[in-house]
Amino acid sequence: MRIACRPSRIYYIHNFIWIMTEEQAFDLLTRVMYETRKNKRYGGDSVAFEWCWSRKLVRMFDALMTKEFRVDNNYAFLTSYPKWREIFATSFEGRIADHLVCDLLRPYIELELHPRTFNNRVDKGSQAAINQVIEDIAEVTNGYHDDARVIKWDLKGFFPNAWCSHMEICFNEVIEKYRQDIAAEYGDDIPGFLRWLAMICIHCNASNNCELRTPQGLWADHIEPEKSLFSKEPGIGVPIGRLTSQTGMGLYINDDVRWLNDDCGIHTTVFMDDGVMVVPEWQHEYALSLIPELRKRLEAKGVRLNDKKFYDQPWRNGLEFLGTHINPWRLHLNDKTYNRAIERIREFNAIEDKYRFIEKFKATVNSYTGLLKNRTEYRRICVLRDAIAPEWWEWLEWDNRRQCIVSKPDYSFCMLLNRKYNLKLKQHDKSRNHRAH
């Protein structure tokens, strides 16, 4: 798609002149926009933005180049699963700004983060963190033969108590360290522009510029003041749900992760605010002696350990990490998540007009079977499959090899669109799938 262009505008950024037409501005932000909406395609903000989206992109570009852009259209709500938590989000333009900062800096952030930090990383994630803990146990116990201890710690109010100024410093250090590489890749003035945009995204003061989408009384009933941004002074606390916040919190404690692993020699795995240390029995006292020093290092940044969530047991007793019970030679999804899966299937089974919810039902069930497949949970997968009402099998079928549900050929997503909008989309031809040969 192309948009109409007016004559080139000249944008002055300090002493740097950037000549760009509206069409070039459109091309600049389109890639970031597609990346932003990739996993939020049907969200309300994404749908609203796509009305006159090319015009909105050009308007956003104008605001960025004149440094008038602000992240001030925020909203807050509560989620009760897996526990009550305060979530802040922003408009689609604000999310594009988050992606603009994090995507351009992603290669350099990856170089800076310690390999034992797993949240918001390329080719990492929660399952990779769980696998790392399993590998640490196998290595420290010499193939599950020797004694070892597992120490698990948790950070209390990680996001609401973080200092915005310290997070800004973390981003600035990455930008300054790789300034020459960033300038060579994108332009001489881009490092300064990224510093400014990171500052705008971090210091958005979301609690004072937001719309409440959950009744205010629920905050007092379910959210502790220490875990709410509404009880914090300006400059304290970053919103959960923002990409800059989640990426920045990895940088926030990166020095502490490096200190534990490289300086102290302790096998430590960190995912967001959860940490697991695996130590041999002879090193147990030494590892415990590091906890007070770790506490001091974190308190110097406004973060503290949660004394109620400290776990220290022999490795044979197992542990729960990121919703998974890690036991010797087996993994189990925790009961709360599994029971939620059964509950969600029953909710879909109660719907009368099931045909309208085929794709949503399929995505929901497969998200839970995907969690179970990565663990020793074949029996639970079968129970989950048997909980599906018979009416669904009119349009869906079970794939035994992949352990998930798939649409029957006549009810694939393309066929549903063809029937609804009288289209002529072609269905995927399995005979041309070269990976099957």
Label each residue range with its predicted role:
Residues 1-58, 418-437:
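Non-catalytic, polymerase-adjacent accessory regions of viral genome-replication enzymes
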Residues 2-4, 11-13, 102-163:
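Active-site-proximal segment of RNA-dependent polymerases
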Residues 41-43, 47, 72-96, 112-124, ...:
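Short, conserved non-catalytic motifs in the polymerase core
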Residues 72-74, 269-273, 308-310:
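Short Gly/Ser/Thr- and Asp/Glu-enriched loop/turn motifs at secondary-structure junctions
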Residues 90-91, 95, 99, 218-235, ...:
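Right-hand nucleic-acid polymerase module
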Residues 136, 141-272, 277-290, 313, ...:
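Conserved polymerase palm-domain catalytic core
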Residues 175, 179, 294-303:
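A common structural junction motif
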